[in-house]
Amino acid sequence: MSEWTKEQRYQKYEDVDQQTIEKLTEQVNQSEYRQTFHIQPQIGLLNDPNGLIYFKGNYYVSHQWFPLGPVHGLKYWYTYQSKDLVDFKAIGPTIKPDTKDDSHGVYSGSAFEYHDHLYYMYTANHRDSDWNRISTQHIAKMSKDGSINKFPKAVISAPPSGYTQHFRDPKVHVQDGVYYAMIAAQNIKKQGRILQYRSTDIVNWEFQGEVQTNLDDFGYMWECPDYFNLNGYDMLLFCPQGIDSEGERFKNIYQSGYIMGQYDINNLTMNHADFHELDYGFDFYAPQTFLDENGQRILIGWMGLPDINYPSDADGWAHCLTIPRVLTIESGNLKQRPIKALEKLRTNEETALGYANKFTRQLHPYEGKQFELIIDILENEATEVYFEVRTSKTESTLITYNKREQKLTLDRSESGQLPEPVEGTTRSTYLDTPLSKLQLFVDTSSVEIFCNDGERVMTARIFTDENATGIKTSTESGQTYLKFTKYDLKGDTI
């Protein structure tokens, strides 16, 4: 793919003729990798989820969007509306780069309710004549007719002294009638940080200081912060950049994770345990959370990473969002489970019960490209158990469980075309308890694996041939007694 010029990357969607848009749309629609039950861009590139909220009977889900190709360029917010987080209606581009402050992109932010109206707080990105970045924080209000009206000027016009222009991704939450914004930042020592602001009227924001953690030197930038209380635990989510890999940990180019403990919002001190990754697969970044209509904490992430090329780029589009996950804390541990509403996509239930051994078994009539597969491990005497999905004579996506180490490994070395550059073709995680259950959500070009009822999650894009539809199981030695439940998933291409 030819290199994009600066002029091409910062061309406005509104300035492109309809014929060009139709040509792009036709190219994308012909892609063999299009998903069926994930939010994906109609054309161009999707990245961070933005502005997630349940408001007056509807869910609103937005994402970063560059319309004109599978590269990072002039960013818009593209918004969807839903009643159930399964079926989505496209509203279209809602927050657009149409002022001087956001001339080079409307960057990530969050949604919140204030005086019975929906508001968004976001980062405006501007470049001066020397291409220096200028980051400011803005607010926009959604009117009753759905139109978006920006406040006339920035509510935070510059980062505080001691911090660089890497100052973005405001996440707003309210506590005791006070509005707080957590903002991703970088100090002048090139260390990632989170800054806290407060407001009582959402116009005037007071800088309170830097959130104090024990992660003093933990990457050169922290992106996409999120803060909430879950079952009595304070959770601080962020995405550190510049972390070296440690064995099986931190192998992706950038990380997404959390620290859990107790946060003193007045003194800005976080007493916390270790940083943990939210997802142990290949393709997960920039997660954001919100409360659903029942008060459950829901997480949606970007199923992709910056600075990596994906095979779908050749078809004029890139990336998708993950399925929504419900977060809970159980016995002091974070659990992530797929939302129950996804069950409405299920059709054609099939079940099987039996032993797997060292002779590979093709599970007939189990096959498919878009399905949910639940594997219950009822007895396990095998040293290693192997599960393969999207298999053909030449391709396979392999999940391995090592009983002695309680180690689960996702291997996409034979999954077809691979994103690049990516470190290695496997990702692994060590489970807290022996493997008893796997729940897989497989779409045309992705797999999301929930282990032990939400103990771990592994997410990956796979760019497999459309004829790779088989499902297999076997062991290294010994046998395991398994129950399989499979559903075809029927989603309307979003």
Swiss-Prot record:
Gene3D superfamilies: Exo-inulinase, domain 1, Glycosyl hydrolase domain, family 43
Cellular component aspect of the GO annotation: cytoplasm
Binding, substrate: L45, L46, N47, D48, Q64, Y107, S108, R168, D169, E223
Entry annotated with the keyword Zinc: no
InterPro entries in UniProt: ConA-like_dom_sf, GH32_Enzymes, Glyco_hydro_32, Glyco_hydro_32_AS, Glyco_hydro_32_C, Glyco_hydro_32_N, Glyco_hydro_beta-prop_sf, Suc6P_hydrolase
Coiled-coil ranges from the UniProt annotation: none
Record keyword Phosphoprotein present: no
Catalytic activity: Hydrolysis of terminal non-reducing beta-D-fructofuranoside residues in beta-D-fructofuranosides
Active site residues according to the UniProt entry: D48
One GO process term, biological-process aspect: sucrose metabolic process
EC code(s) of this entry: 3.2.1.26
GO molecular function: beta-fructofuranosidase activity
Enzyme's top EC category: hydrolase
Keywords recorded for this protein, A-Z: Carbohydrate metabolism, Glycosidase, Hydrolase
Pathway(s) this gene product operates in, as recorded in its UniProt entry: Glycan biosynthesis; sucrose metabolism
SUPFAM superfamilies: Arabinanase/levansucrase/invertase, Concanavalin A-like lectins/glucanases
Family to which this protein belongs: Belongs to the glycosyl hydrolase 32 family.
Full protein name: Sucrose-6-phosphate hydrolase
Source organism of the structure: Staphylococcus xylosus
